[in-house]
Amino acid sequence: MEKGVQERVPHAKPPFTLSQIKKVVPPHCFHRSLLRSFSYLLSDLAFVSLFFYLAIAYFPLLPHPFPYIAWPLYWIFQGCSLTGVWVIAHECGHHAFSDYQLIDDIVGLFFHSALLVPYFSWKYSHRRHHSNTGSLERDEVFVPKPKSQIPWYLKYFNNPPGRLISLIGTLTLGWPLYLAFNMSGRPYDRFACHYDPYSPIFTKREWIQVYISDAGILGMAFMLYRIGVEKGSFWVMRIYGIPLVIVNGFLVLITYLQHTHPALPHYESSEWDWLRGALATVDRDYGVLNRVFHNITDTHVVHHLFSTMPHYHAKEATEAVKPVLGEYYRLDRTPVLKAIWREAKECVYVEPDEDADSDKGVVWYRKKL
């Protein structure tokens, strides 16, 4: 149900099980259609191709000052379309694209590499995020810190100008910094990097796939280099680089807002269990972009419950599970820009309630430093 946006989600063990939730979902929602999945991918690629063609064929013909209007529009529209492609590749990593794991991995590897994402590397770390959502010790990304671990300099950014600088930096650089340096990721006992097969993120049996992911990135980087030699680096940045920055920004924005909310609990190991962690997420409303992003934005709760479910069934499944989840389900329709500003202000660190002796393993966001 839709509650007051800052009214806390229940943190006690739910009075239902995952199997009880699954029983109310229509069985066809779990069916993965290779043809239907490819139809969404091809639709995204058609829009990407259209915007690319318009940019290279017609933008050079525009009289001054229309290029200054056309190029930003291209970057926005192309960035949104490529985010849709990114989501489909993410779905491949969940084995939600088709019934064939090999096809899923080939499609996911190709299109994530095209967007400079190490497919298998992120697939494995993201799988652990799904296995440990809401856990302070084991979740993989956007893990909130207790007040005692807040960096000393954060107090200088806990104001409107500081928050703006922090948000701009996070949206533009957060994704590549996470992949390369594990920024905002789970702390490890040594350096962690998605490009390093021997990183503590990965097990020994995953090393080969990490090498394959790196090869995909190197192949794409070499292709961009060759295009840059032929067309110039400025051409590459205008056509590909800036839309990619927008894709990365949307990825961080979407993920941050799915898991950061004043009403959501996080759990220490003494209290955490998988179902409560999976329910410690929130659906958001991005308007028309919900469809452009294949509803990864407004069906995230059901995605955490059933990650192999294809996106085109997630809306129906969400409506089906709402009566069972009751107050454990949260949809926040706050406009996205307002929401990210509120969350940056309200969700600074986590602490347990002072008067909750029996719930010391449950922590909530706080803002007062």
Curated annotation (Swiss-Prot):
It is a multi-pass membrane protein. InterPro entries: FA_desaturase_dom, FAS_N, Fatty_acid_desaturase. It is found in: Membrane. GO terms for cellular component: membrane. CDD domains: Delta12-FADS-like (cd03507). Its EC number is 1.14.19.-. Delta(12)-fatty acid desaturase producing in a heterologous system linoleic acid (18:2(9Z,12Z)) and to a lower extent hexadecadienoic acid (16:2(9Z,12Z)). This is Delta(12)-oleate desaturase. It comes from Trichosanthes kirilowii (Chinese snake gourd). The gene is FAD2.
